[in-house]
């Protein structure tokens, strides 16, 4: 599948290290591109950023709930499920590639990992945990690592009402996330 003129990059690193930003900038260096994202809200955010840079007539948004497809679109920002399979483009990126391990949607991410290729560049963005799997499944992949801009550290248990600025709250279930959000002081920006 990978020919000599195609390049495949796995840009891996922790959350919030600028991987998506790098891929947006890289995509816009090419004439055409598809960007697959795991969430429709994230797809909308990337769509808005691309529209600001190149204009509304050059960017399409395709999700399960929303379709904005100008006839002159060169860049297609999509949820991974909505990525056009038959469209040939210079650049393809798939964000949060570690979703290959997801019970419900993993098969779609895995299919894109194995089959989706840009004519010139393909980028897989996500967690370093995917490094070995990508290396085993994708030929001639180049690995690039992104480091976190700032250090995260554990400061112990604190009351939610006494949180400092720039604090990350870690929760391990949707119920814990919902409860935490409901108990946050209304003065905090979430």
Predicted regions and their residues:
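Phosphate-binding P-loop
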Residues: 1-6
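Hydrophobic anchor at the beta1->P-loop junction of P-loop NTPases
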Residues: 11
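Conserved lysine of the Walker
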Residues: 19
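Conserved strand-helix element at the start of the C-terminal RecA-like helicase core
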Residues: 33-42, 164-179
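Inter-Walker segment of RecA-like/P-loop motor cores
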Residues: 53-85
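Walker B catalytic acidic pair
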Residues: 95-97
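Post-DEXD/H (motif II) to motif III coupling segment of the RecA-like Helicase ATP-binding lobe
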Residues: 102-150
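Conserved small/polar residues in nucleotide/adenosyl-binding loops
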Residues: 180-186
């Amino acid at each position: 599948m990978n020919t000599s003129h195609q390049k495949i990059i796995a840009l891996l690193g922790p959350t919030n290290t600028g991987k998506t930003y790098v891929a947006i900038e890289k995509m816009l260096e090419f004439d055409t591109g598809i960007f697959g994202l795991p969430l429709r809200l994230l797809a909308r955010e990337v769509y808005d950023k691309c529209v600001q840079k190149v204009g509304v007539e050059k960017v399409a948004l395709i999700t399960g709930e929303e379709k904005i497809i100008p006839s002159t679109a060169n860049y297609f920002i999509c949820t991974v499920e909505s990525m056009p399979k038959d469209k040939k483009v210079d650049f393809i990126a798939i964000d949060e590639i570690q979703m290959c391990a997801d019970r419900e949607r993993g098969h779609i991410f895995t299919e894109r990992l194995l089959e989706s290729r840009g004519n010139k560049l393909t980028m897989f963005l996500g967690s370093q945990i995917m490094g070995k799997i990508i290396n085993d499944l994708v030929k001639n992949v180049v690995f690039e690592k992104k480091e976190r801009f700032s250090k995260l550290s554990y400061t112990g248990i604190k009351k939610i009402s006494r949180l400092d600025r720039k604090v990350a709250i870690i929760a391990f279930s949707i119920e814990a996330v919902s409860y935490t959000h409901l108990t946050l002081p209304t003065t905090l920006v979430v």
